[in-house]
Amino acid sequence: MSKAGGNDSKSTLYCSFCGKSQHEVRKLIAGPTVFICDECVELCMDIIREESKSSLVKSRDGVPTPKEIRRVLDDYVIGQDFAKKVLSVAVHNHYKRLAHAAKHNDVELAKSNILLIGPTGSGKTLLAQTLARILDVPFTMADATTLTEAGYVGEDVENIILKLLQASDYNVERAQRGIVYIDEIDKISRKSDNPSITRDVSGEGVQQALLKIMEGTVASVPPQGGRKHPQQEFLQVDTTNILFICGGAFAGLERIISARGKGTSIGFGATVQAPDDRRTGEIFRAVEPEDLLKFGLIPEFVGRLPVLATLEDLDETALKRILQEPKNALVKQYQRLFEMENVDLTFQEEALTLVARKAIERKTGARGLRSILESILLETMYDLPGLDSVEQVVIGPEVVEGKARPLYIHGDRAKDAPASVSA
């Protein structure tokens, strides 16, 4: 047992791992024959967390199977089965391609870059963020809206590879095996059907710049960003084996898809076309490369994204599940915040249904759920730190509709705050 010698041996205890005394640390936890301090506990937790980042179960070849990848995605993303399958297979094949390249050189396995198309708030970015947690290859996310052609104000396309290098601690070998997710890819569509009107430095120009790194080239990347440090040496990164996943909401694409195949006619004999009342995600399922060309992507760019995955609109049931089921569900997050005030937060089933309906009405998808909950809980979160006797807060449907205040339960009696009456 770790104790001090001499007169202090009975009074001063020491951590058995780092040797610090009980006076040097906040807590010292006693076991049957040893002691451990809070700092060593934190260190152990950090080690475990680092290990769990790449905790995918490996198959006999060291490659996670699509089902194993899908299982982890299911923990954080509700629905979107087709998109999950596409991503799981793509990442699995990416691992296999890297393993194959190291052992064989008789057949070259080409990569299949992916384009994710889905309405806003359907989970495109969340899928990519979840992949980043679980992969043991370097992963980075980039925003297409910040990119411009080289020589113009904004970020160069090479900055994407620089971010991947940073994610791999500037290990070029590891960076060349990484995965890049480019968000808001629809925002770099050509601004006009006429390709020659003006210089389009943030649209078609960026698509042209992305072509080579997506297909495979040796990119010269400045380690500290090229525009601020022009004299530095460049790192050479081969992008041939880097998998690119692009995602975008493609607002307006549904009209292009719906119009395809519908003949136009005028006059008294014209056929009256019924408006397409299908949901956006349902229309996206019928997308063809020609629709993307009409939207403003150039043919060469579409050709480098051979795998198309569409995401569905989130319905009421899916939004309710998103509120409650994932590991980082919004309801769980707010309940944890309230727990810090020693208060239980409870949502009635009807209240969650109304929150989901509001998000659908706003057409913001899952992204709008947080703002709705924030507005509902704002006054409560403002008042709560000053109310010592509150043990539970109940959110009912009237609260979501703005007709009543949340119900505060004080000790063993229920009481409104200030009164559960119509506003």
Swiss-Prot record:
What is known about its subunit structure? Component of the ClpX-ClpP complex. Forms a hexameric ring that, in the presence of ATP, binds to fourteen ClpP subunits assembled into a disk-like structure with a central cavity, resembling the structure of eukaryotic proteasomes.
Gene giving rise to this polypeptide: clpX
Q: Name one Pfam family in it.
A: zf-C4_ClpX
GO cellular-component term (any): HslUV protease complex
The protein, known as: ATP-dependent Clp protease ATP-binding subunit ClpX
Task: Write out the GO biological process terms.
Answer: cell division; proteolysis involved in protein catabolic process
Chain sites annotated for binding ATP: P119, T120, G121, S122, G123, K124, T125, L126
Q: Which organism is it from?
A: Methylobacterium sp. (strain 4-46)
Matching entries from InterPro entries are given as: AAA+_ATPase, ATP-dep_Clp_protease_ClpX, ATPase_AAA_core, Clp_ATPase_C, Clp_protease_ATP-bd_su_ClpX, ClpX_bact, P-loop_NTPase, Znf_CppX_C4
Q: Which domain of life is it from?
A: Bacteria
> What is its biological role?
ATP-dependent specificity component of the Clp protease. It directs the protease to specific substrates. Can perform chaperone functions in the absence of ClpP.
PANTHER family in alphabetical order:
ATP-DEPENDENT CLP PROTEASE ATP-BINDING SUBUNIT CLPX-LIKE, MITOCHONDRIAL (PTHR48102:SF7), ATP-DEPENDENT CLP PROTEASE ATP-BINDING SUBUNIT CLPX-LIKE, MITOCHONDRIAL-RELATED (PTHR48102)
Q: Spell out the PROSITE patterns in the cross-references.
A: CLPX_ZB
Q: Which GO terms describe its molecular function?
A: ATP binding; ATP hydrolysis activity; ATP-dependent protein folding chaperone; protein dimerization activity; unfolded protein binding; zinc ion binding
Q: Outline the extent of the ClpX-type ZB domain.
A: 3-56
- What NCBIfam families does this protein's entry cite? clpX, PRK05342.1
Which residues does the annotation say bind Zn(2+)?
C15, C18, C37, C40
Return the similarity comment: Belongs to the ClpX chaperone family.
Q: Which UniProt keywords apply?
A: ATP-binding, Chaperone, Metal-binding, Nucleotide-binding, Zinc
